[in-house]
């Protein structure tokens, strides 16, 4: 285990010890069915990324599982702009497609479980499209900027947008806490989620050996 609290399962899989505790907490209560649905939605999202990475012969390095996110590390330097963009947005597209399909089934066979599956997929799609560097939306935005501007302009444009998005993210987090009248549980979850995502941005444990 390294200083980041990572357990090395294999050369291609690492998991945060806090993720294990989070999974135990989710499945310990009566909401185990809904926890399984959420994990299935997350798995669908990440599997879509991995599928296209393999399809386009990108060099796959490892998957790191955090309590509030999963990082897929791969060498995409040999991929074209279009293929890399497809790999980046594959997860969000799979969630969007799952949402559309489940909407159809919800109309025919309404159920709370199916409704939750719909909400999970639309939530994952929306959150991952946030234009922060460690989300799919931020990675896609970076690709688009660097493909359309010279290197210097692209660098400063991307940095400016990244900072603006980070400020917006923090403001939204504060709004969530304020909306709950600063409920201690909500505050703890929001702060931990924010720290986890920014830690993911600052450090990539897949490069540590």
Stretch-by-stretch model annotation:
Residues 1-209:
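Hydrophobic transmembrane alpha-helices and their immediate loop junctions
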């Amino acid at each position: 285990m390294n200083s980041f609290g990572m357990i090395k399962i294999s050369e291609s899989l690492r998991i945060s010890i806090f993720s294990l505790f989070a999974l135990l907490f989710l499945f310990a209560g009566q909401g185990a069915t809904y926890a399984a649905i959420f994990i299935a939605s997350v798995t669908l999202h990440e599997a879509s990324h991995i599928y296209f990475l393999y399809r386009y012969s990108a060099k796959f390095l490892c998957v790191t599982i955090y309590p509030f996110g999963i990082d897929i590390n791969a060498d995409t330097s040999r991929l074209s702009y279009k293929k890399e963009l497809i790999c980046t947005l594959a997860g969000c597209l799979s969630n969007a497609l799952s949402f559309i399909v489940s909407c159809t089934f919800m109309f025919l066979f309404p159920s709370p479980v199916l409704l939750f599956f719909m909400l999970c997929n639309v939530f994952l799609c929306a959150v991952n499209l946030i234009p922060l560097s460690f989300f799919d939306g931020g990675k896609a935005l970076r690709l688009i900027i660097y493909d359309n501007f010279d290197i210097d302009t692209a660098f400063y444009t991307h940095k400016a947008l990244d900072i603006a998005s980070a400020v917006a993210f923090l403001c939204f987090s504060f709004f969530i806490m304020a909306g709950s009248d600063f409920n201690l549980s909500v505050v703890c979850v929001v702060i931990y989620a924010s720290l986890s995502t920014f830690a993911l941005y600052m450090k990539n444990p897949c490069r540590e050996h």
